[in-house]
Design a protein with these regions (language model features):
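Extended acidic/polar, glycine-enriched regions
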Residues: 112-118, 203-310
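A short, compositionally biased
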Residues: 5-10, 83, 211-214, 276-281, ...
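Short acidic/polar inter-strand loop motif in beta-rich domains
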Residues: 126-133, 287-292, 324
Length: 353
């Protein structure tokens, strides 16, 4: 089964022929402040003196020490849980890929690029603001920065009525090595409704040369993997209880599907309308009698509908329904507790509770 081998620490940050220590998760501006190269952006108007940071390119580096234990795995993956935002990733000089979305996880298979001993992992960060300058926004308008809506990062980084203009920048979430079987479950997506139906969509990382139609149905393909593998599905209403429902299906390719019907499903309701029961699932990938990959999670039985009704010739009213019942929706805004997303900690959240 895949497992986390190690988190990657001991990063450095290089720019203008200078190299300083960097913290990951973290932020480039915060690293510069720790090194005494910029002022405290939270003091007075000093944030205006750091605007140059988001105009520069920076390079992160760290070392992956590959021993025989690591190299004995079929698959070794370097995982980035969050890079803000534009970057190119290299291992030993080989380009692994580019990032352009702060909110996505990026995964790169590196087993064939590793050699025993030290391997250099490099992340070349590209200026967010310079990239935005190239975006054509003719005909668009937005407050604070008309180009911000085209960049997949926290929009408050471009300034707001409650925050200064501090464009956070860097590796803001964990970086780690996963290793294990070459064949594994990439993702499980669950769609459930208020009738007790639950559909499980399972994506495997099999090497398949295939063509899919617009509905995602494979119309032709050739498989490099064995197709006598099995997927086992288990569903229960308690975290560690014996499965109430289970099913086994044959693997048919990269995308697989299974359905369950629960005649006595307990429905999920918003607070004030009922309870919020969650069901637990576990999906196992079996090969040659051994479980080689597992994914688990929780889901709820519910149906969410936005009902639109005419209110005249040109006006439409709308009503949100949960499980066919009209609900009144209200809420509030949460202002981030830090301008620099990468330095937010659980302790800072607890201090506010």
């Amino acid at each position: 089964r895949e497992k986390m081998y190690a988190k990657l620490n001991n990063w450095t940050l290089t720019f203008d022929n200078k190299t300083i220590s960097a913290q990951v998760p973290g932020d480039i501006t915060v690293d510069l402040y720790r090194a005494g190269l910029v002022k405290n952006p939270y003091f007075g108007l000093d944030y205006k003196d750091i605007e140059w940071v988001a105009r520069r390119d920076f390079t992160y580096r760290t070392t992956i020490c590959a021993d025989k234990e690591l190299l004995n795995n079929q698959s070794v993956t370097v995982v980035f849980d969050g890079i803000d935002v534009f970057a190119d990733v290299y291992l030993n000089g080989t380009h692994l890929g580019a990032t352009k979305n702060m909110f996505l996880q990026y995964r790169y298979e590196i087993r064939n690029l590793l050699h025993e001993g030290n391997n250099t992992l490099t992340v070349e960060m590209h200026s967010t603001l310079n990239a935005m300058d190239k975006i054509d926004t003719t005909g668009y308008y937005a407050i604070f920065n008309e180009k911000r809506m085209f960049v997949r990062k926290a929009q408050c980084h471009f300034g707001w009525d409650w925050a200064p203009k501090i464009c956070a920048y860097g590796i803001w979430n964990d970086v780690y090595i996963e290793c294990g079987s070459k064949q594994k479950i990439n993702d499980v997506y669950v769609v459930a409704d208020d009738k007790g139906n639950a559909a499980f969509f399972v994506e495997l990382n099999y090497n398949i040369n295939s063509t899919y139609d617009t509905l995602g149905v494979m119309v032709k393909g050739s498989y490099e993997e064995k197709l006598d593998d099995k997927l086992h599905f288990y569903v229960s209403d308690e975290p560690f209880a014996e499965a109430d429902t289970q099913k086994t299906v044959e693997v048919v390719g990269k995308k697989n599907f299974a359905c369950f019907v629960n005649q006595s499903a307990k429905l999920w309701w918003p607070v004030g309308y009922g309870e919020q029961p969650l069901y637990n699932y576990r999906v196992e990938l079996e090969r040659d009698g051994k479980i080689i990959s597992v994914k688990s999670g929780r889901f709820a039985y519910r149906t969410v509908s936005l009902v639109e009704e005419p209110k005249g010739d040109t006006l439409y009213g709308y009503q949100l329904q949960i499980n066919g019942v009209d609900v009144f929706v209200k809420g509030s805004n949460w202002i981030p507790i830090e301008c620099f997303t990468g330095v937010v900690t659980d302790d800072k959240y607890r201090r506010l509770t």
